[in-house]
From Swiss-Prot:
Motif (PRPP-binding): 97-109
GO biological process: DNA-templated transcription termination
Function (record text): Regulates transcriptional attenuation of the pyrimidine nucleotide (pyr) operon by binding in a uridine-dependent manner to specific sites on pyr mRNA. This disrupts an antiterminator hairpin in the RNA and favors formation of a downstream transcription terminator, leading to a reduced expression of downstream genes.
Organism: Leuconostoc citreum (strain KM20)
Cystine bridges: none
Gene designation: pyrR
Keyword entries, A-Z: Glycosyltransferase, RNA-binding, Transcription, Transcription regulation, Transcription termination, Transferase
E.C. designation(s): 2.4.2.9
Quaternary organization: Homodimer and homohexamer; in equilibrium.
InterPro entries: PRibTrfase_dom (IPR000836), PRTase-like (IPR029057), PyrR (IPR023050), PyrR_bifunctional (IPR050137)
Catalytic activity field: UMP + diphosphate = 5-phospho-alpha-D-ribose 1-diphosphate + uracil
Gene3D superfamilies assigned: 3.40.50.2020
Family: Belongs to the purine/pyrimidine phosphoribosyltransferase family. PyrR subfamily.
Protein name per Swiss-Prot or TrEMBL: Bifunctional protein PyrR
């Protein structure tokens, strides 16, 4: 297998900054906004976007991370647990949610995340932000905020590297 870097650290940072500005424009600041990162890498991206929002708008935005494993359509034993402790639970009722993930591919992870969010409350709106949209949708799901569109072949994979886990920031196509 070979890896081809398609976003370096600087490009990844610019993509997150662009997403942040688009979130500000859409939400007219940060009031009633909650960022929800899909574990694992979406969680780190959500925190980074929240930090940028705080720097730009002077408002601290709540960030929540959800584990959607039990809401996936390929998991047989559902226990409807999000793996959240009480400190991690944020009231999402009547809030404007931005759901954040690293890669949008078939749409199945996002569908599971939507099910998980509805399970814990009824938000006012839900928007989707992804660092990379690679196409090949199996469900009618579209991101509202996209860092970079990277068309791929069906047999290729997108690998998002984040400093917090991988020691560097980059996006690679794996052949």
């Amino acid at each position: 297998m070979t890896n081809k870097e398609v976003l370096d650290n600087a490009s990844l940072q610019r993509a997150l900054t662009r997403i942040t500005y688009e979130i500000i424009e859409r939400n007219k600041g940060g009031q009633d906004l909650v960022l929800v990162g899909i574990k694992t890498r979406g969680e780190f991206l959500a925190h980074r976007i929240a930090n940028r929002l705080e720097q730009l708008e002077g408002v601290k935005i709540p960030v929540m991370a959800i584990d959607i494993t039990n809401f996936r359509d390929d998991v047989l034993n559902h226990d409807d647990s999000l793996g959240l402790n009480d400190e991690e639970k944020t009231n999402i009722a009547d809030k404007n949610i931005v759901l954040i993930d690293d890669v949008l591919f078939t749409g199945r992870t996002i569908r599971a995340a939507l099910d998980a969010l509805i399970h814990i409350g009824r938000p006012n709106t839900i928007a989707l932000a992804v660092l990379v949209d690679r196409g090949h949708r199996e469900l009618p799901i579209r991101a509202d905020f996209v860092g970079k569109n990277i068309p791929t072949a069906q047999n290729e994979k997108i690998k998002v590297l984040v400093q917090e886990i991988d020691g560097r920031d980059a996006v690679e196509i794996v052949h």
